From Swiss-Prot:
Keywords in alphabetical order: ATP-binding, Cytoplasm, Cytoskeleton, Hydrolase, Nucleotide-binding
InterPro entries per UniProt: Actin, Actin/actin-like_CS, Actin_CS, ATPase_NBD
The protein, known as: Actin
Entry EC number(s): 3.6.4.-
Subcellular location: Cytoplasm, Cytoskeleton
Predominant cellular place of this UniProt entry's protein: cytoplasm
Function: Actins are highly conserved proteins that are involved in various types of cell motility and are ubiquitously expressed in all eukaryotic cells.
Entry's family note: Belongs to the actin family.
Upper lineage: Eukaryota, Viridiplantae, Chlorophyta, core chlorophytes, Chlorophyceae
Source species: Volvox carteri
Any one Gene Ontology molecular-function term assigned to this protein's record: ATP binding
Catalyses which reaction(s): ATP + H2O = ADP + phosphate + H(+)
CC per GO annotation: cytoplasm; cytoskeleton
Length: 377
């Protein structure tokens, strides 16, 4: 266990899009790779090529031209446990090069996940990887830790799920947590669709990865959508070019801000949900009237989908319009927010006060997977 001080805990933030893994106490994850398992589309014909039946992470990404890529985590929930096991195996043995039976492991999950999801995670860690101890933490809570606060509302938006989690004095307020199954992957799909209207066809799982890259490099959030649309229509100042892997350039104009606009107006993709600003506001309104002021003043952005330029200004504008007029609104967008869940996990797992919180293997052997609900909130 961690008391001796030599053995550091492992922190593994399994996102729908990327796995962030490393050692507790470090200030950044050692390994960041896509949560992808790829399988060959065609059978191998070359003798001695040593073809594998599956590839994980970056290797799957680099061979994507011949593979079908699958993400085992959808909307923050593991949908394919065999593939998930491959990802964990890859994380421990290939990326971090550690023996999991020697280190406590801190895992993360989305709030409001099905109970069975955490139980299965717990079971695989103890039974397949023989870890000595483990813990499952809520992603948004870790992000708040990383920002150095104990009170605030975290808007955490990754590749698969977005949620707003109000936290007061270190406690998440479960009744006020809201979840929106709209995140980065949906934006990528929408960008594929609107690029199609421009005459660029992206259809395969491999081509989706190209569009994701376009999204990450060129998209931004407009402060005023209508005004930006007018600007885009009247001049080509907003146009940018992107070079495809085969050298062909494509031009992208109003798609740059139309894509992330979905976050504020999900009806653009036919979703009946309200936008991230309304979700944040609704979440605050579900909290006790006495603590709302502290939440308005500490709106913390977290996750890769909050990395769009202009998102904090737009968020401030939208929340200001919804909140009482004299209310002080502060949106915090830490530069490292893409990894703030992992960083918070690194901080938590290295606290001396946390060491009694781990679920030990002996406790698991006694109580089974359901122990996770008693020990982890």
């Amino acid at each position: 266990m961690a008391e001796e001080g030599e053995v550091s805990a492992l922190v593994c933030d399994n996102g729908s899009g990327m796995v962030k893994a490393g050692f507790a106490g470090d200030d950044a994850p050692r390994a960041v790779f896509p949560s992808i398992v790829g399988r060959p589309r065609h059978t191998g014909v070359m003798v001695g090529m040593g073809q594998k039946d599956s590839y994980v992470g970056d290797e799957a990404q680099s061979k994507r031209g011949i593979l079908t890529l699958r993400y085992p985590i959808e909307h923050g929930i593991v949908t394919n446990w065999d593939d998930m096991e491959k990802i964990w195996h890859h994380t421990f043995f290939n990326e971090l090069r550690v023996a999991p039976e020697e280190h406590p492991v801190l895992l993360t999950e989305a709030p409001l996940n099905p109970k069975a999801n955490r139980e299965k995670m717990t079971q695989i860690m103890f039974e397949t990887f023989n870890v000595p101890a483990m813990y499952v933490a809520i992603q948004a809570v870790l992000s708040l830790y990383a920002s150095g606060r104990t009170t605030g509302i975290v808007l955490d938006s990754g590749d698969g799920v977005t949620h707003t989690v109000p936290i007061y004095e270190g406690y998440a307020l479960p009744h006020a947590i809201l979840r929106l199954d709209l995140a980065g992957r949906d934006l990528t799909d929408y960008l594929m669709k609107i690029l199609m209207e421009r005459g660029y066809s992206f259809t395969t799982t491999a081509e989706r990865e190209i569009v994701r890259d376009i999204k990450e490099k060129l998209c931004y959030v407009a402060l005023d959508f209508e005004q930006e649309m007018a600007t885009a229509a009247s001049s080509s100042a907003l146009e940018k070019t992107y070079e495809l892997p085969d050298g062909q350039p494509i031009t992208i104009g109003n798609e740059r801000f139309r894509c992330p606009e979905v976050l504020y107006n999900p009806s653009l993709i036919g979703m009946e949900a309200v936008g991230i600003h309304d979700t944040t506001f609704n979440s605050i309104m579900k909290c006790d009237v006495d603590i709302r002021k502290d939440l308005y003043n500490n709106i913390v952005l977290s996750g890769g989908t909050t990395m769009f330029p202009g998102i904090a200004d737009r968020m401030t504008k939208e929340i200001t319009a919804l909140a009482p007029s004299a209310m002080k609104i502060k949106v915090v967008a830490p530069p490292e927010r893409k990894y703030s869940v992992w960083i918070g996990g690194s901080i938590l797992a290295s606290l001396s006060t946390f060491q009694q919180m781990w679920i030990a293997k002996s406790e698991y052997d006694e109580s089974g997977p359901s122990i996770v609900h008693r020990k982890c909130f």
